[in-house]
Amino acid sequence: MSLLDYFKSKKKPSTAVMAKERLQIIVAHQRGQRDTPDYFPQMKQEIIAVIRKYVHISDDQVSVQLDQNDDNLSVLELNVTLPDR
């Protein structure tokens, strides 16, 4: 019987726990986007447009992030996955 008890004892996390975890992820994501300037989405699209003049890429091959430090310093990070020739 102990073998059957082993399989019965596994419980799924409650819906409240799952909802709490999802909410924490959403809140963390929104906090990260709150500090971005208003011009950032347009700047990102313009950067992608310039890259597309020279290389055929899709939007998911470009990652643009703006990190702000406590020292009033902003860092723009751009990662582009280039296709093979």
UniProtKB/Swiss-Prot annotation:
A GO biological process held by the record: regulation of division septum assembly
Keyword Cell cycle: yes
Record keyword Ribonucleoprotein present: no
Superkingdom of origin organism: Bacteria
UniProt-listed InterPro entries: MinE, MinE_sf
Keyword tags: Cell cycle, Cell division
UniProt family annotation: Belongs to the MinE family.
Protein role: Prevents the cell division inhibition by proteins MinC and MinD at internal division sites while permitting inhibition at polar sites. This ensures cell division at the proper site by restricting the formation of a division septum at the midpoint of the long axis of the cell.
Full protein name: Cell division topological specificity factor
Organism: Shewanella sp. (strain ANA-3)
Taxonomic lineage from the root: Bacteria, Pseudomonadati, Pseudomonadota, Gammaproteobacteria, Alteromonadales
Name of encoding gene: minE
